[in-house]
């Protein structure tokens, strides 16, 4: 289905990184893009740059999200907002569990619950869930993050069953290491994390993820691209080992 058959899009976690890149790409495609994130200043800068409609809303604010979805019939929804905390379940606190489950899984369930029935009724729509290779593979630490992303992986497959017989498509994007500041947010030191995980590595850019999503959305109506694993060429599939070459 070409982009011209869709009119509106919702992107969560839209103020930076992959979310901002997705907003930029969708705006270039002529969509009315609603960008949702907590940081009003960054959203306003994004709106000036792209023409998107900013919404300074916490993805976990169910009342605010509900009002927005009641006002706009979204044709495309990209569930991109996510958080991670370092450490395994052995040293996790109550907040570590609650925050990651609420943002990474519960908020996605609610947004899909609020938007997918309209897509089914219109016989048109596309849900894109940003998951992770952590949904499928195991590596050290981040136990709760793994569990929440595994939930998104299962949900993405189940939504295809729920929409059986309707032209509502579902795509799960499973990135590996991407050149964003997520590692800095997890470890609490963006500069140190960039030196450890980003600088000197050949990594996909946020725009590469946005291009992959655009490819899935622009596919013919009879084609549902269900899952994409997007890793650096030099990252070992299924792990965090990424080779640095001169």
List PLM regions with ranges:
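Conserved glycine-rich cofactor-binding loop
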Residues: 15-16
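Substrate-binding pocket helix/loop in short-chain dehydrogenase/reductase
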Residues: 88-89, 96-101
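Active-site loop immediately N-terminal to the catalytic Tyr-X3-Lys motif
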Residues: 90, 139-143
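Active-site helix of classical SDR
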Residues: 112, 148
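Alpha-helical segment proximal to the catalytic Tyr-Lys
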Residues: 117, 161-164
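Residue(s) in the substrate-gating loop at a strand-loop-helix junction
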Residues: 132
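C-terminal helical subdomain
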Residues: 172-173, 192-239
